[in-house]
Amino acid sequence: MNELGSLGITKQRQAVLQVIKDSEEHLTANEVFDHARRLLPGISFATVYNSLRYLKNEALIGEVRFGMDATRYDRNLTRHDH
């Protein structure tokens, strides 16, 4: 994650990105928050949510929607249907 730091990615965003990269599943924002708190106990839900939006806008993560269910986040940006 050091190279991300040199690009101006905060430690909070690095933690959120790490959680998503380490997961084998599509995570909701709440799930990302739960995992990120293990890496950075003081991180807030708002910070996680804003980090997810930033990382998505920078094309570092993908956003997956399954109908009316909660939005989920994925490290894999290639299209895949379930």
What spans do the regions from the language model cover?
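Short capping segments at the starts of secondary-structure elements
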Residues: D22-T28
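A short acidic, leucine-rich amphipathic alpha-helix
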Residues: E31-R37
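Basic amphipathic alpha-helical segments that dock to polyanions
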Residues: V48-E58
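Non-DNA-binding regulatory cores of transcription-related proteins
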Residues: L60-H82
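Short alpha-helical segments that sit at the start of domains
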Residues: M1-Q18
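Short coil turns linking two alpha-helices in DNA-binding domains
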Residues: S44-F45
